Amino acid sequence: RSSDLPINDAKVEWLFKNPINDGGQFTGISDNLYKYGVVPAEIMPETASSSNTKLLGKMLARTLRQTGIQLRNASEKGESLAQLRKRKEDGLKKVYRLLSLNLGVPPTSFSYTLKDKDGKVISTETYTPQSFYERFVGTDLRGQFVMLMNDPSRPYYKVYEIEYDRHAYDGKNWTYVNLPMDEIKQMAIASLKDNTM
């Protein structure tokens, strides 16, 4: 909880400067896939905002900052935990509305027709995003892979975890093993050669 810290605390400043990131770390993707599932592009196609997220990211960041300031001010005025939770939920409703308007509302269930390479129908079934993930991915990707990174500002051959860098509240922080670039390069080449990537 950062509301007990002064507004000029380094952690608070970082949270307000970076209320949302562009994503892309494997741990965040695997957390979200496991939690929410997936849908085929035919069911939920790209939108202008999903293929170019810069403006949406700015709108989300502004909404999150406004909500954060409102929560801090309300906390300083002594509002109850129930009142603060209500304010937080109101802020999250604004976030959901922005996402829904820009990306669409994900389906809770959908029918999908599986076809072979020649276009012949194999089956048509009803799925939820989670059941589609289970059927076509079938593996819980969380904890199955290790991220390798080159960060020369930190000692090599150690595991690092970046606090507050996750895609879901209950997800895992971005964690990586810090290695010299030459070793990462050798591992990438070996992985490509033996098809384990």
Please give the residue ranges for each predicted region.
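Flexible glycine/proline-enriched surface loops and loop-helix/loop-strand junctions
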Residues: K11-K17
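Loop/turn elements at helix/coil->beta-strand transitions in domains of secreted/extracellular proteins
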Residues: A41, N195-T196
